[in-house]
Amino acid sequence: MEPVSNATVYIVDDDAGVREALAWLLRSRRLPSESFDSAEAFEAMLQTRPPQRQPCCLLLDVRMPGMSGLALFDLLVARGSLHTMPVIFLTGHADVPTAVDAVKRGAFDFCEKPFSDNALVDRIEQALAQSGERLAELRERS
């Protein structure tokens, strides 16, 4: 699959090692990313940035101190943000039922830790393609 141009992968995980490993993996596949150490930090960025015009997706840890990944997901659902910003949950084995429930409520997918690099990148590329298609549809309507 061809990389989507001008796309950004947002990484939200409280574990610095996970954030760094994901950022490195994405760089190695020529996928730009921005990392956040908490749901609150990501939410603050969303409040200050202009409306989304480029494809993006969100890699979101389920369990974090403070606002959990699920709480952030619920906020994004309430705002209608999932249409153009697909969410891929990163989860430990114990959180798989929770992640499956989130997929039923609109998350793009979930990947269980430890995950296969190739499988994760494939899902990210699919999520970015979906984001790009939906943004193009919105542009055509306006």
Describe these PLM feature segments.
Residues 2, 16-34:
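Two-component/phosphorelay signaling modules centered on CheY-like receiver
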Residues 37-38, 68-74:
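Acidic catalytic/metal-coordinating carboxylates
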Residues 50-60:
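Active-site beta3 strand of CheY-like receiver
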Residues 60-61, 91:
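Active-site residues of response regulator receiver
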Residues 64:
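Receiver (REC) domain active-site loop signature in two-component systems and cognate sites
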Residues 95-97, 111-125:
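C-terminal output helix
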Residues 125-139:
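The C-terminal output helix
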